[in-house]
């Protein structure tokens, strides 16, 4: 009979742990793509961009991985834990329609870091739209101006055009990094 209180305690702890498991699983986004074990060329480009541009908070590359159909995902970027996360509807719009979104995020309550985000079509060396590139810049001093929007659009365009010169084809982004 002396074992009963200990057994009840163990059972209570186990039940509490099991009860919170679905909540933890719900917090993590469901991945729609798994990257290969080795670093891909796209990740190398992302790493090089971040190293060369301290004004950036992040860069992410999005699109449909080769061999997939309508699986829009982040496949490289400065947030490795997000690789394989499904794209949001606005990400897909940029990829499909070739539009650019200028998103000054200095008033968002969910973002802990103030930033200026530009979502734009990613291009290859030939100028073909091949997906989405997202640049998040450190917050400008005067973010509420059209001059800030023009400045960040110009910076993002220059970065994107420079990146395009390093992309022979979309498929090459998924080749092993050298």
Give short role names for the model-derived ranges.
Residues 21-25:
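Sec/Tat signal peptide C-region and signal peptidase I cleavage site
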Residues 112-121:
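A short beta-strand signature within small-molecule sensing/ligand-binding domains used
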Residues 29-43, 137-178:
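Juxtadomain coupling helices with adjacent low-complexity linkers
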Residues 131-132:
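Short glycine-/small-residue motifs
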């Amino acid at each position: 009979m002396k074992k009963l209180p200990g057994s009840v305690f163990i059972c209570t702890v186990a039940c509490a742990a099991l009860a919170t498991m679905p909540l933890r699983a719900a917090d993590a986004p469901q991945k729609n793509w798994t990257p290969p074990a080795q670093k891909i060329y796209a990740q190398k480009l992302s790493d090089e961009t971040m190293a060369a541009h301290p004004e950036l908070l992040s860069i992410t590359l999005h699109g449909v991985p080769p061999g997939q159909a309508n699986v829009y995902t982040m496949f490289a970027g400065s947030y490795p834990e997000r690789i394989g996360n499904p794209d949001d509807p606005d990400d897909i719009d940029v990829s499909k329609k070739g539009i650019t979104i200028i998103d000054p995020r200095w008033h968002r309550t969910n973002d802990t870091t103030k930033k200026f985000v530009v979502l734009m079509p990613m291009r290859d060396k030939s100028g073909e739209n091949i997906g989405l590139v997202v640049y998040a810049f450190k917050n400008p001093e005067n973010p509420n101006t059209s001059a800030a929007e023009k400045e960040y659009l110009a910076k993002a365009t220059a970065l994107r055009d420079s990146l395009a010169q390093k992309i022979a084809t979309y498929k090459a982004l998924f080749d092993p990094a050298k």
